[in-house]
């Protein structure tokens, strides 16, 4: 039995639904929401690599590497902002993030 395109698409769909489920179930913690969004982005990247491999084209795989690089940078910046926010406010609850003033 070989692993085909359908298997990769099923795994990506499960990851994407898990990410959506994580966002809807836990709306109070910003870190869990950020991790759920990253999980959804990972599912999209798995789809791009699977279709790229299935079609025999490397462009999707190269584009996925760029997307993963940008996603790592945005996750690092997002966590740094959350650390600074926690130091100033003492909490990272979603309802407290809405009352920020510039």
Curated annotation (Swiss-Prot):
Where's it found, cell-wise?
Answer: Cellular chromatophore membrane
Q: What is its EC number?
A: 7.1.1.-
Q: How does it sit in the membrane?
A: Multi-pass membrane protein
| Keywords linked to the UniProt accession | Membrane, NAD, Quinone, Translocase, Transmembrane, Transmembrane helix, Transport, Ubiquinone
Give this protein's Gene Ontology molecular function annotations: NADH:ubiquinone reductase (non-electrogenic) activity; quinone binding
> NCBIfam families given for it?
PRK05715.1-2, PRK05715.1-3, PRK05715.1-5
- Name of the protein in question: NADH-quinone oxidoreductase subunit K
Q: Which organism is it from?
A: Rhodobacter capsulatus
**Chain's gene name:** nuoK
């Amino acid at each position: 039995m070989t692993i085909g395109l359908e298997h990769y698409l099923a795994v990506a769909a499960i990851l994407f639904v898990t990410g959506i489920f994580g966002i809807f179930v836990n709306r109070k913690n910003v870190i869990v929401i950020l991790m759920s969004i990253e999980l959804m982005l990972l599912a999209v990247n798995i789809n791009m690599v699977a279709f790229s491999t299935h079609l025999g084209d490397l462009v999707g795989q190269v584009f996925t590497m760029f997307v993963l690089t940008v996603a790592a940078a945005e996750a690092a910046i997002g966590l740094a902002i959350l650390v600074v926010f926690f130091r100033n406010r003492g909490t990272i609850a979603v309802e407290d993030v809405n009352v920020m003033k510039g």
